Amino acid sequence: MLKEKTSDVSMTNTNQGSGTAAEAAVPMSHGLWNTWRKNLLLFCLTGVYVELCLHLCVFGSMDRYAGYPVLFGLLGGALCTLVVSSLPKVLRQITGVFLVAAQVLLAEVQLVYHCIFGDFMPVSQIGMGGNVVVNFNSQLLYGIRQNLLKILLLLLPLIVVILCLALRRGQALKLRLRWKQTMASFAVLLALLLTVTGLMYVGRDNAFSVYRTFTNVNTSTDSSYKKIGMLATTAQELRYMLFSGSGSIMITPSSLNMSDVPRTYSSNSYNVIESIDFTALADSTDSDILKATDEYLSNATPTRKNNYTGLLKDYNLITICAESFCPWFISEELTPTLYKLSHTGILFENYYGTFQSVTTNGEYTMCMGLYPDMSRTKTDSSFNVAGTNYLPFCLGNALKGMGYQAWGYHDYIGDFYNRNITHANMGYTFKAADSGLAMKIDWPSSDLEMMEASVDDYINSGEPFHAYYMTFSGHYQYNWDNAMSAKNRDAVKDLPYSEPVKAYIACNLELEYALEYLMQRLEEAGVADKTCIVLTNDHYPYGLTEDEYNELAGQTLDTTFEKYRNSFICYVPGLSENIVVDEYCSTADILPTLLNLFGVDYDSRLLAGTDVLSSGLHVAVLSDKSFLTKAFRYDAGKETVIPADENTTVSGKLAEAYRLYVDSRFQLSGNILNSDYYAHVFARESSGGSLADTVVFTDIKSIFNQASVLYMYRKGYVEPEAPDTFGGKATARLGEFVDVLYRIAGRPETDNTALPADYENEEFNAAHPYYNAVCWAYQTRLLRQNDPNTEYDDKVDYQTACVLIRRYAIMAGVDTGVDQTQLRQLLRDAPDLGREAAKAMLWCDEKDITTRDSSLDELLASAGTRISRYQMTSFLFYLCTYELDIGS
């Protein structure tokens, strides 16, 4: 007897005959295939819509690369269809909505991030998200408000998918039909994949082709988003991060700066360290990345020493990386100090800031003379990776070796971007607004207050000094909510500009006032005539729109090159006449130029930048690897060569040689960073070139949480729960809280006479690790018998933490007064809160000890919420640095 072929659809109606059921199965099966086709169309259109919408929202128009985001959007849609086709009914609908929601959410995040920072966020920086929310929450809300319509447009496909999938009445499919639909989805995906691969492969030989963009590990996130879109970029970054281990290490040489065979150079004529033998170094290592770098540098040509070598060897040096600085607001009337600095000394007429956004990239390049790692394999910012590397050429370390004091300052929190680690490693005694500088933290903070709080550290020391400043007053947003813009509003009220441009100028006036104060103090100390001041920007002021920036500049600037034109101010008093330099240069060239001017022994082959005052090759390099020379400009985005004038002819061979040279600068920088190359060259013990070496505890993942924990741990104030685990998520206990305060106090002698009766027992006695701390706490009345929490094992909430912190501050002689009007209002609004607790929470909020960029109402609402060990550590870290001034 033959077995009948079963239907792909479960049939449950037993009132119909077998013939009727068989007839019904066919149209029902067709209907289910129609549903599959609709799903395929829905997911593919969603992928295309999200890609095109994001592209248009960010770039403003379509270009010749827009077709590839469309194709990858189709691929993403086919992949979604493949995933949901293999799932049962309910799970199929839930998964479909989830996949689209994830796609839309990523696009929304990138849109807002681009609005705030001017570029796209790499997957490797997703861990910074929490820090952005905490430290940039007002900017985050501003970005959302500015892009609300675009955000709603990006939400449309999610709404459509929810309506089409979640509200659609699905039918159960037998495994056989699910398998067929899965195979059909796979076939569509494969066809699209072959099509896209074929199209990319056709143009693979072009240096900046879509194929190279997609496959090259060193492709930047911005370039990738523009050429291949969000989905493909995210997929590639995830693939390299999760499965690829390391990126490219080979450096392709250019004929412009390489000799055919290794040569020996004399330090009398060249900026080299003669003891370095790159060939011998290559033979001494088994590391592929070290060997590749050694072999490349063995043929590299160094820069020549020149008439300016050692010109400033008797000078002090102050370097300033100025937040969002540009030269267009400088005038003799409005900014006389900046005007004087920019017109006296060495004048660089063709300087370009390399970066569109991200302070840490510009700051890193200025300080290191190297480009940051912008490849897909990076897992952290380059500054953080360099935080454990050997860095002999950073100005702090280099000048300290010549007898200079070296100080570093920033007028925001010190653990942001881990500056308390990275800048100390560059040789600076580092202070920030929350760690060592007596100044107010604001958004943004005052450059003038930073200067006032720091100058006395070095100006009257009688020793040569180098001071480095990372400013903050020029940070966006440019409106009257900006603290520095509001402060200086009257000074710009009559200027003929729009409000954002006025606000930009107003907040940058704080830098002018800081420099005015600095010059005054230098004069008073009698060292003004022997102090060189260098200033440049970290990045383009992305907080201004293109039209607003043109308004400020008084001209229409092209967005590929001229918007990056900026200032490398090198103020040198005492020269008989200004030195005018017309060579093209950019951020990475500042360090080698200063090393040469100050007569530092360095090897120019070990830096990506070039001494601008030397003879030879000079290029202004931008972050997307576009560049400018005297003869021509190269637009990497469009892959076009633009001659300097109509009489200049640029051969393809010459353009390619320059392109390879620029590419080699980035690859060399990445190799030096990721291998701790200087440690290899100078036979120092290598740290491995990873921030992981500085992370003591595996459960403290965020680089922005590490600083407070490591600070408190290294000071001996807190103990981890295990050698490699801090235990930050565990609930804080009263005994440990007072023990940390006891350690901060210096572990004074104490006894048990103040302990409440019956407090000691079998579990808590003189052998207990918190015994002395609890005895001390009761003896000093830090703990009191009528407190809500008195037992050493009690869990600590926000209210208790605030009370203990304020009590300790009073013991330490800190002014803990609060506004009485605000206190009375608080007691009326929160009648259940005791007077002491109200004072404590109000004071802790005002001093930003327990809250950061959040309101008092939020703190009060959390009064009874228990805090974690990490929160305890963070609060007490801010007590130490904000109020007790215990240096970092």
Walk through the language-model features, giving the residues of each:
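Intrinsically disordered, low-complexity repeat and linker tracts
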Residues: M1, S7-A25, M250-A300, Y678-Y717, ...
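Sec-exported extracytoplasmic/periplasmic mature domains
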Residues: S342-I346, Y371-P372, K400-Y404, I459-N460, ...
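Feature responds to low-complexity, polar/acidic, surface-exposed segments characteristic
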Residues: S687-Q706, K715, E719-V738, Y742-Y771, ...
